[in-house]
Curated annotation (Swiss-Prot):
Molecular function GO terms recorded: cyanuric acid amidohydrolase activity; metal ion binding
Annotated site residues (Important for substrate specificity) in this chain: T325
Domain of life (superkingdom): Bacteria
Organism: Bradyrhizobium diazoefficiens (strain JCM 10833 / BCRC 13528 / IAM 13628 / NBRC 14792 / USDA 110)
Region (RU A): 1-106
Protein name: Cyanuric acid amidohydrolase
InterPro entries associated with the record: AtzD/Barbiturase, AtzD/Barbiturase_RUA, AtzD/Barbiturase_RUB, AtzD/Barbiturase_RUC
Subunit annotation: Homotetramer.
A single BP term in Gene Ontology: atrazine catabolic process
Keyword terms, alphabetized: Hydrolase, Magnesium, Metal-binding
Broadest EC class assigned to this enzyme: hydrolase
Family as reported in the entry's similarity comment: Belongs to the cyclic amide hydrolase (CyAH) family.
């Protein structure tokens, strides 16, 4: 098995088109552009169907990296996995997290335990009528397994976060399916985001053995007892396939980072966030074990679909001015930021089948100096 070293760099941005921080790190030699495998980002759009800050950010990054790699911007987008999550409500701060990977001859002497590893895979392009249905679940499950192999992770227990970028429906895509005599899961562009996120998350659950493979189309957005504890899915208009990024710990990794996770049972589950921090030797800011430093936190958030949090009614689902996903990102983002001591954390809205209903997974990456 090959040995790899993974790097993780959190870079603040002044806007969705800001690449100055990344270019500065490349210029200083801190980041080798040829080693960049994935970029996860938070952009200050609305996180909805018409949030073009995600596409803008990807275009800016691809244009900036193209001459560094000797590729066209289109080729850069095929080479690197870009996952932009729109919506930095409340105290959430726009930023990108750059993951690099390079092969090394062996693990350094004295390096103990499993360390952070990353793997990537893509599904095929989906037909509009396949989104939110069994085909998307099955293809995603296969891609998760491929990404695990790419990361050198064999045991599902070592997988702590699976980030997926998935497609959504537009009126043109719905019409294309109809012209072929097929119906889509929904005709609502906004509603399709939930279907696509949910089916993708169930694909993760199937791949990791968190649920059986006998999931039907009717289970998506209905059987909320079926979920993955590590899936994080974000829908966007800019693609028609799923991009799958697996983050976990591997004995084949020589990185100076470690990842752990917990599952929030609801939007105010501070204990779960604290548990995730403790998994990697961290505590509520500024507490940490010697030789441990927080790099970033990744979490999912959603308004509880039953309309209540711990028995008290919430109004996030009834607000016609602000979507429930924006409410949830702001609430969970504030909670995590308070515990982490920073608003530059990755909190994504819409957690269908990603953790229990109303909750969601939370993962923490720490840098180890030992």
């Amino acid at each position: 098995m090959r040995t790899t070293s993974v790097g993780v760099f959190k870079i603040v941005t002044k806007g969705p088109g800001d690449v100055s921080g990344l270019m500065a790190m490349i210029g200083s030699g801190a980041i080798d552009p040829k080693s960049i495998l994935a970029v996860l980002g938070k952009t200050e759009g609305n996180g909805g169907v018409n949030d073009f800050t995600r596409e803008y950010a990807v275009a800016a990054l691809c244009t900036a990296l193209a001459p560094q790699l000797g590729l066209s911007p289109e080729e850069v987008e095929q080479r690197i996995a870009f996952v932009m999550s729109g919506g930095t409500e409340g105290v959430l701060s726009p930023h990108i997290t750059v993951f690099t990977r390079r092969e090394v001859e062996r693990r350094p002497a004295g390096l103990s335990g499993k360390r952070l590893s990353i793997g990537m895979a893509h599904t095929r392009d989906f037909l509009p009528e396949e989104l939110g249905r069994a085909a998307q679940i099955a293809e995603t499950a296969a891609a998760v397994k491929a990404a695990m192999a790419d990361a050198g992770i064999a045991d599902p227990a070592d997988v702590h976060f699976v980030q997926i970028k998935c497609p959504l429906l537009t009126s043109d895509r719905v019409e294309a399916a109809s012209a072929r005599g097929n119906k889509t899961a929904t005709t609502s562009a906004y509603g399709s985001m939930a279907y696509s996120r949910g089916a993708s998350a169930l694909g993760v659950a199937v791949a990791l053995g968190e649920t059986g493979s006998d999931i039907s189309d009717g289970d998506v957005l209905r059987r909320y007892d079926l979920f993955s504890k590590v899936a994080s899915t974000s829908a966007g208009i800019e693609l028609m396939h799923n991009v799958v990024i697996v983050l976990g710990n591997s004995a084949a990794s020589a990185s100076e980072f470690e990842i752990g996770h917990a599952v929030m049972n609801d939007a105010i589950d501070a204990a779960a966030v604290t548990s995730a921090l403790k998994c990697v030797g961290l505590g509520v800011a500024p507490q940490a074990e010697a030789g441990r430093e927080l790099v970033n936190i990744f979490a999912k958030a959603e308004a509880s679909p039953d309309g209540s949090v711990r028995g008290f009614r919430h109004t996030m689902l009834e607000d016609t001015d602000i979507s429930s996903t924006r409410h949830a990102r702001a609430a969970v983002g504030g909670l995590i930021a308070g515990l982490a001591g920073t608003g530059a954390v990755y909190v994504s809205g819409g957690a269908e089948h990603q953790g229990p209903a109303g909750g969601g997974p939370v993962a923490v990456i720490a840098r180890l100096s030992d």
